[in-house]
Amino acid sequence: RQHLQAQGAQLLFWCEGRDCGSSSLWANQIFGSAKLYGPEEQQSYLLLRLAEPQDSLLALYGIVRGNRRAYLHVEQLDAGAPLPTLLPTAGTLLRQLRRDGQLQLALVDAPNDDWSALLVQTLRLDSTLRLGLSGIHADAWRTALQQQGVAATRLQLQGSEGKGLTLQPLR
């Protein structure tokens, strides 16, 4: 995941363990491969949009079976036409923020409605989460999030350097 993201891939969906649902569903109905069946606690699924100029999605499903053998299923989905704007899920952003200790979003422009709504939804998943915002438009993003109902006490400016928007949990 981190290697693909370092190459510019955008993480759209990420689940682990029981959050992914039934491994039987993934193995048999989605991927059509019974060898991917195993304990739900030992599974992970990622969906990424590959970096431009590719208009492709990459799906990765990994599981460690009861016999301790690890399996990884990878599918690249190449689009026949340019893909529309695709945003990650709020749960994916929260999982990434917790795991990596920060979110670096390539949001170089002023706030837009779609991303503002997504970030508000992400913050609603954890009402105790406080964030530090940094980046060239961090102040504008903080204002946009506050206008959509996020309490000012949950958002703190940490600088205007750097491209995009960086979010870091505050303790």
Language model regions located:
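Short glycine-rich, basic-tinged beta-strand/loop micro-motifs
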Residues: 125-135
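A glycine-rich helix N-cap at a beta->alpha junction
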Residues: 152-156
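An acidic-aromatic pocket/loop used at catalytic or ligand-binding sites
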Residues: 1-125, 139-148, 159-171
